[in-house]
């Protein structure tokens, strides 16, 4: 009897229905890379359906729907958790839009964004919507008011996410004091924490130790990528060296201008199409990875972690995302007037000594922090712990959602019903059926 009771108390957590919103098409995207590593593990524990911009019925071996079908799928068989991966770029813009329609758990890869996004995103009265979440009797915000942000940040997306995960310690630190109000099941229940990006170093082989010193970088050719600092430092090395520079096609012209300016055309090879897979191939023939980036935009992962995890020496800027990297795991450079001199000294030290073998601390760090099985276990635990809170929030949000439908339907009906100006009743003949398909009732 006692054994039976103990077995019952240790029963496995129930399988949850997860709506997984993520860009799955961008080969160089963080969301796509994380999904490929985590979904095969998480799908063994939970019922996961993908929502993307693709119309394919299956992606990564799981059911896939176009994201505009999410509401109807949820109505037919409700999801326990809506999960979003938020990153910069046009390919993931739909995620920014939809998480304002249905709150959930958001994994923020990029807190600072390069564009304002769609009209529904940057002109959203999200702060007023949060007030309505707690007081459904408030009137809806006027749509005629422009609410443009001076600089695109994911404040709206974080505030509308009861549980927010950050793949960068820098992003988590920056957001802690920036948002005063957010959606919560109860005061103080909002959860924000760091969740590392998973990586796989499988297939990355060790480079020849006796070959000429070989460098690799994914730095962008703009000022923030610091190429105008590290290219002349490389040129100053006395012995032979090679650099493989992985860039996006749109960056090719700027990169070519730089390598001509510093007369290193013969030593630099440009590879087009930045992606973790191509980076892994490049690392197999590289000794040192250059990750000098001095900007809040973008992310060092998974490229830096792949370099460290595969035993490469790495050089990072000691600002923004580079601050979180321990000095025992990478050479850290301070941007500024002494930056070139620091980079040159590091290159010379690597060239003259056996420093390229001193990578064990970094490998241990990555093996522990970025293991896909560990990340999947952490994420599954977050899903389980958050499910009761999300059920409360969903119920309250649904009431607000229906109120918005009623208000919009009344406005549309008034504007489109038959009159001397309309030969047909537009609402009755054209719109009512569409609204019913969306789950809206008049």
Per-segment meaning from a language model:
Residues 283-298, 312:
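Acidic donor-binding loop of glycosyltransferase active sites
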Residues 360-442:
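C-terminal amphipathic helix plus adjacent low-complexity
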Residues 55, 242-255:
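Glycosyltransferase donor-sugar binding loop
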Residues 19, 165, 207-225, 244:
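Conserved donor-binding/catalytic core segment of Leloir-type glycosyltransferases
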Residues 32, 222-236:
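A conserved mid-protein helix/loop that constitutes part of the nucleotide-sugar donor-binding site
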Residues 147-191:
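A short, active-site helix/loop in glycosyltransferases that binds the activated sugar's phosphate group
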Residues 255-274:
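Nucleotide-activated donor-binding/catalytic signature segment of Leloir-type glycosyltransferases, i.e.
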């Amino acid at each position: 009897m006692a054994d039976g009771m103990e077995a019952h108390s240790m029963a496995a957590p129930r399988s949850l229905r997860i709506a997984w919103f993520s860009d799955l098409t961008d080969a160089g995207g963080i969301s796509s890379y994380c999904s490929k590593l985590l979904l095969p593990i998480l799908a063994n524990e939970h019922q996961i359906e993908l929502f993307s911009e693709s119309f394919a019925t299956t992606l990564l071996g799981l059911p896939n729907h176009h994201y505009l079908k999410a509401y109807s799928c949820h109505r037919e068989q409700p999801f326990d958790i809506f999960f979003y991966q938020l990153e910069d770029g046009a390919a993931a813009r739909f995620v920014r839009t939809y998480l304002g329609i249905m709150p959930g758990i958001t994994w923020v890869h990029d807190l600072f964004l390069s564009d304002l996004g769609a009209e529904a995103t940057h002109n959203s009265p999200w702060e007023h919507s949060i007030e309505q979440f707690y007081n459904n009797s408030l009137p809806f915000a006027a749509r005629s008011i422009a609410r443009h942000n001076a600089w695109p940040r994911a404040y709206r997306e974080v505030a509308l996410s009861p549980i927010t995960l950050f793949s960068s310690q820098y992003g988590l630190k920056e957001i802690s004091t920036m948002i005063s109000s957010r959606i919560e099941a109860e005061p103080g229940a909002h959860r924000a924490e760091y969740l590392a990006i998973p990586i796989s170093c499988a297939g990355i082989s060790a480079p020849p130790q006796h070959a000429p010193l070989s460098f690799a970088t994914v730095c962008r050719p703009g000022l923030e990528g610091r190429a105008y600092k590290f290219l002349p430092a490389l040129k100053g090395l006395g012995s032979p060296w090679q650099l493989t520079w992985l860039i996006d096609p749109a960056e090719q012209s700027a990169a070519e201008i730089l390598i001509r300016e510093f007369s290193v055309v013969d030593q630099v090879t440009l590879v087009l199409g930045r992606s973790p897979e191509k980076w892994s191939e490049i690392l197999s023939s590289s000794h040192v990875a250059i990750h000098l980036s001095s900007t809040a935009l973008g992310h060092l992962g998974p490229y830096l972690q792949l370099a460290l995890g595969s035993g490469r020496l790495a050089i990072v800027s000691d600002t923004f995302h580079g601050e979180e990297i321990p000095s025992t795991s990478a050479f850290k450079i301070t941007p500024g007037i002494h930056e070139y001199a620091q980079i040159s000294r590091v290159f010379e030290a690597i060239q003259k000594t056996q420093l390229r073998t001193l990578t064990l601390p970094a490998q241990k760090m990555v093996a522990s922090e970025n293991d896909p099985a560990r990340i999947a276990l952490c994420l599954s635990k977050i899903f389980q712990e958050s499910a009761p809170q999300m059920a409360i929030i969903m119920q309250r949000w649904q009431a607000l959602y229906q109120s918005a439908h009623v208000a919009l339907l009344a406005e549309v009906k008034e504007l489109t019903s038959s009159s001397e100006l309309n030969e047909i009743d537009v609402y009755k003949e054209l719109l009512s059926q569409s609204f019913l398909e969306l789950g809206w009732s008049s």
